[in-house]
Every structure is written in structure tokens, then in C-alpha cells.
Amino acid sequence: MLAVEIQMNTDDIGVLSPTSTCHTFDESADGYGRGEGVGAIFLKRLSDAIRDKDPIRGVIRGTAVNANGKMTGITQPSAKAQENVTRTAYQFAGLDPNDTSYFETHGTGTQAGDPTEVRAIGNVFIEDSQREELLVGSVCVPIS
């Protein structure tokens, strides 16, 4: 955050909002506002948490990644790549996307990123289902 070079580089490629506010999934989306936040996740083997009688808030059942550093980059997101990695994570976890009622997004607040992400989410969670709605959110808005 404090390095002026990073601020200048992100401004040069057009991802920073001139209003310094992230308008995720909004027609006025014009980039993101830089901000700082901390999220902490404490991981423990499920068997250990049960043994220790810890409150269990969630269980990680599967993960997936598809960024290799060789693709087009952050200014040209791929809906197909996002769709594929989401489907892979669900397959690894043994979960059915139709059982999902809420999806937390990246939510960049950019004209390229938001529609691409929504398209991928729709392809995974809406296209082949009978669902009427899927709640979608992004932590980017309150942080930036």
C-alpha cells in the first residue's frame, strides 16, 4: 500500500477507481479503491478440533488453483478459466454446485472483471440448475 510505484502502476493500467471506491457489480463500476484489511483463518485437522472440543465454523473439503503466471494477466480475466477452477474445486470436494446458496466473489469493481466473474458464476451455479436465485457477495466493497 505504501509503495508509490505500485500505486502508479495500478493507476496506469486502469484498474483503480478515480473515486477511490469499489462499485462491485454496479453499472458505475470504474475500478477498485485500494485499502487494507486483515482476514485470519485458523486451520486445524478436523479430528483434532473434534478431540479438543473446538467450535468448528467450517470445513475445507477441497481446493483448486489454475493461475500459472503465464497467462494474460489481471487486466484480461477469463470466464472459462474461472468456471473451470470453480468446477474443479467442487469436484475435488465432492460437492454439488446446486447445493450452494451463497458465493463470495473477487468482485473487482472493474468493467472487465465483474462481468467475467458473473458469467463464470452463472455457468457453474445457474445454467444447469432449477434454482431461482444465488446470493453473491464481495468483501472488496467494505475494505476499499
Give, region by region, the residue ranges found by the protein language model:
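Condensing-enzyme catalytic core of the thiolase-fold
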Residues: 1-144
